[in-house]
Swiss-Prot record:
A Gene Ontology BP annotation from the UniProt entry: negative regulation of translation
Residue stretches spanning the membrane: none
A Pfam family: Ribosomal_L13
Superkingdom assignment: Bacteria
GO cellular component labels: cytosolic large ribosomal subunit; ribosome
GO MF entry, a single one: structural constituent of ribosome
Subunit structure: Part of the 50S ribosomal subunit.
Family assignment from sequence similarity: Belongs to the universal ribosomal protein uL13 family.
Gene that specifies this protein: rplM
Name of the molecule in the record: Large ribosomal subunit protein uL13
Record's keyword terms, sorted: Ribonucleoprotein, Ribosomal protein
Organism taxonomic ancestry: Bacteria, Pseudomonadati, Campylobacterota, Epsilonproteobacteria, Campylobacterales
Amino acid sequence: MTKTAKVNDIVRDWVVLDAKDKVFGRLITEIAVLLRGKHRPFYTPNVDCGDFVVVINANKVKFSGMKLEDKEYFTHSGYFGSTKSKTLQEMLEKAPEKLYHLAVRGMLPKTKLGKAMIKKLKVYRDDKHPHTAQTSKKDAK
């Protein structure tokens, strides 16, 4: 019989990922897999069985091609003429946390379960983070 995961049986780990000199898309894919729990043998789609993920050195990630200048992110408040855009370079300098959340959110389910998963993602610009107590028992990847 196939064993399904129960909410009470899940033990969540804290995984620290260093984004320095890693390709952004591949890093985001790895984060999404860890948040969903697809790396576990008892993965169940309707249960949040993923780990907590801490990303350090978020603004030192690499992009291929001319994405830093060409890729744009748009926001709209709902009023006429209020469309604003920022390039990837501006987003990376001003708010790398938001950039990671936007990219990972696109790979997670668009449900309440997806919102619970994205709350387990912690992104920090440099190598200092307040989660050393949770992650001290393991080495950083």
